[in-house]
From Swiss-Prot:
<feature type="domain" description="LIM zinc-binding 1">
    <location>
        <begin position="150"/>
        <end position="208"/>
    </location>
</feature>
<dbReference type="Pfam" id="PF00412">
    <property type="entry name" value="LIM"/>
</dbReference>
<feature type="compositionally biased region" description="Polar residues">
    <location>
        <begin position="22"/>
        <end position="52"/>
    </location>
</feature>
<feature type="short sequence motif" description="LD motif 2">
    <location>
        <begin position="70"/>
        <end position="82"/>
    </location>
</feature>
<dbReference type="InterPro" id="IPR017305">
    <property type="entry name" value="Tgfb1i1/Leupaxin/TGFB1I1"/>
</dbReference>
<keyword id="KW-0007">Acetylation</keyword>
<keyword id="KW-0010">Activator</keyword>
<feature type="short sequence motif" description="LD motif 1">
    <location>
        <begin position="3"/>
        <end position="15"/>
    </location>
</feature>
<dbReference type="GO" id="GO:0002102">
    <property type="term" value="C:podosome"/>
</dbReference>
<keyword id="KW-0597">Phosphoprotein</keyword>
<keyword id="KW-0805">Transcription regulation</keyword>
<dbReference type="GO" id="GO:0042995">
    <property type="term" value="C:cell projection"/>
</dbReference>
<feature type="modified residue" description="Phosphotyrosine; by LYN">
    <location>
        <position position="72"/>
    </location>
</feature>
<keyword id="KW-0130">Cell adhesion</keyword>
<protein>
    <recommendedName>
        <fullName>Leupaxin</fullName>
    </recommendedName>
</protein>
<keyword id="KW-1003">Cell membrane</keyword>
<keyword id="KW-0804">Transcription</keyword>
Length: 386
């Protein structure tokens, strides 16, 4: 495609500069003119042939660089250049080459001794550069003029044929490439960063955020949590593997958990039902309790007075605490909180340890037993000595 670049250079120029040896070229557009007629006078503005008073139209081929004040006559009706159809760059080049072959039979052009042989197809870029040098003189002689479509932002040369507009500039298709891998972008989607173009693969690999789970680039939706980025499908509970729903997640030791697993694994457990304590709770016996679970271990009544008794890590009301410890009075059935008397495998309040017959308090714990009852010595003798 470098041939098209050369085309643009002279398509852009309306006149060409040449060396002194081409100061008097043979024009392919002036037929039947003698050598004397080809000389350009300095004062007249038109050229006329002998025997013909009407002025001849002169086609401007190119301007020269001669230091002498010789000037070509003005072109009255310049001949339009035959432009190739704007179908494709390859079609334009083919038509141009055919036109050159036809004109070479009429125009005498000095051979270019510096012309190099074309390399093979494997070195096609070097071949195009060589063709540019070969075609430059022929294009100047033909006077082909074309309006370029712009200048390539990469090579700074005119663009003919296909053109790509991107990043606010124009490019040859073969020059609009990925900054990293140098692959042609063409009409493929690309990404811009700092004024440079990247293909999708390289852009995501170089600049896209990485998933904290799989470490792959995130090319679509990105989820940000725990100061990291994630693929939405890779942000899930560390215990059960379920993707988090609307209820969100809980974090523990830099790992995300769903609410169910977090509470089951890390929230404090109720000392009564062993389920997680979520809201209101009571703290007692170095653990937490649901209010409805903090009750007597035997009668399951709540502690309305605010006091309880602990036995074997469980709370009890006063009555059942003493019952389990065997400190209920055998006579009245009430807890014994002070002094007590132990007799017949039971405990008694001192005031309740009395004779079963006369109901007098047995002094100093001296008593007689009959049928699991206590008697004072006097009543026992009276009732059972006969």
């Amino acid at each position: 495609m470098e041939e098209l670049d050369a085309l643009l250079e002279e398509l852009e120029r309306c006149t060409f500069q040449d060396s002194e040896e081409y100061s008097n070229p043979v024009s392919c557009h002036l037929d039947q003119q003698s050598t004397e007629e080809s000389k350009i006078p300095q004062t007249p503005k038109t050229l006329s042939s002998q025997g013909n008073t009407s002025p001849l139209k002169v086609q401007l081929v190119y301007a020269t660089n001669i230091q002498e004040p010789n000037v070509y006559s003005e072109v009255q009706e310049p001949k339009e250049s035959v432009l190739p159809p704007k179908t494709s760059a390859a079609a334009q080049l083919d038509e141009l080459m055919a036109h050159l072959s036809e004109m070479q039979a009429k125009v005498s052009v000095k051979a270019d001794t510096s012309r190099k042989p074309l390399p093979d197809q494997q070195d096609h870029k070097a071949s195009l550069d060589s063709m540019l040098g070969d075609l430059e003189q022929e294009l100047q002689d033909l006077g082909i003029a074309t309006v370029p479509k712009g200048y390539c932002a990469s090579c700074q040369k005119p663009i003919a044929g296909k053109v790509i507009h991107a990043l606010g500039q124009s490019w040859h298709p073969e020059h609009f490439v990925c900054t990293h891998c140098k692959e042609e972008l063409g009409s493929s989607p690309f990404f811009e960063r700092s004024g440079l173009a990247y293909c999708s693969k390289d852009y995501h690999r170089l600049f896209s955020p990485r998933c904290a789970y799989c470490a792959a680039p995130i090319t679509d939706k990105v989820l940000t949590a725990m100061n990291k980025t994630w693929h939405p499908e890779h942000f899930f509970c560390s215990h059960c593997g379920e993707v988090f729903g609307a209820e969100g997640f809980h974090e523990k030791d830099k790992k995300p958990y769903c609410r169910k697993d977090f509470l089951a694994m890390f929230s404090p457990k109720c000392g009564g039902c062993n389920r997680p304590v979520l809201e209101n709770y009571l703290s007692a016996m170095n653990t937490v309790w649901h209010p409805e679970c903090f009750v007597c271990g035997d009668c399951f009544s709540s502690f309305s007075s605010g006091s309880f008794f602990e036995l074997d890590g469980r709370p009890f009301c006063e009555l059942h605490y003493h019952h389990r410890r065997g400190t209920l009075c055998h006579d009245c059935g009430q807890p014994i909180t002070g002094r007590c008397i132990s007799a017949m495998g039971h405990k008694f309040h001192p005031e309740h340890f009395v004779c079963a017959f006369c109901l007098t308090q047995l002094p100093k714990g001296i008593f007689k037993e009959q049928n699991n009852k206590t008697y004072c010595e006097k009543c026992f003798t009276k009732l059972f000595s006969q």
